[in-house]
């Protein structure tokens, strides 16, 4: 499996993980003020997940651009 294919598979997993993180944050916001103490933890997890996904997408673009050259 090439680096590009491996990264695409990773992005697919990260995308699913990011949707789950987004829903966790959404669910938490709907239940406020219950569990307000977990806002920072859930928000940080969501941020980290989306940051990792964005970084992987940038790397994929770079790899694809390099492969096309």
UniProtKB/Swiss-Prot annotation:
Record keywords: Nitrogen fixation
Annotated Pfam families: Rop-like
InterPro entries reported in the protein's UniProt record: Helix_hairpin_bin_sf, Put_N_fixation
Keyword Ubl conjugation appears in the UniProt entry: no
One GO BP: nitrogen fixation
Family classification: Belongs to the UPF0437 family.
Record protein name field: UPF0437 protein AZC_3451
Biological source species: Azorhizobium caulinodans (strain ATCC 43989 / DSM 5975 / JCM 20966 / LMG 6465 / NBRC 14845 / NCIMB 13405 / ORS 571)
């Amino acid at each position: 499996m090439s680096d590009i294919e491996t990264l695409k598979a990773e992005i697919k997993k990260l995308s699913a993980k990011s949707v789950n993180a987004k829903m966790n944050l959404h669910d938490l916001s709907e239940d406020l003020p219950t569990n307000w103490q977990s806002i920072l933890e859930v928000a940080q997890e969501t941020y980290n997940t989306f940051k990792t996904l964005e970084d992987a997408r940038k790397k994929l673009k770079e790899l694809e651009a390099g492969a096309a050259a």
